[in-house]
Amino acid sequence: MKSEVPIVLNTELSEREIFLIGSIVSQWGFLESDIFEQTLLSFEDGEDLPASMNNAQFSSVLKLWMERVANKQDGARQAVLKAQYDEILYLSDFRQAVVHSRWDWRPDTPDEITAVRVHKKSVKRVKFTGDELADFSTRLGQVRYRIRYPGGPEDRATELAESGGYISRRGFEFLFGRAQLPDLRDD
């Protein structure tokens, strides 16, 4: 039996760019889930859920989260959550570019990639460097942390104390010898 080598098209993205785009997509997915879960927990058992909780459009769930979760907090916690809401709105256009575009690059600017898409009958182009993608991913991680722990490290410590502790996937793999050193690095 003859073995065929699969023929595939290259994305023309570097390994770092592929990793960072994947990180952004993953972080945003978790962000949407965090917002949805917090909003869902704001409803009483048996209470009718609004159509926005069908989770078909994140912007609708986000508005409901602002109303039912963020605006119900006191003082500093409310300020932290409102700031995250503003950051999510700001980052949303970049997320759309990352997720819904075809990527392009030019030989005269090899350290830059351009996300190209059609939106509302116009062509949109957003340029990114690897460092900008890394910054975007980090900002999303920070937003997620602040949404889950608006009181900061004290909230995280309380959660850990109440749950009896936690070990990350990386920690688990490291302890049980399943991870390779390159898998544990973020660079």
Per-region residue spans from a language model:
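Acidic interhelical loop/turn segments
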Residues: 105-123
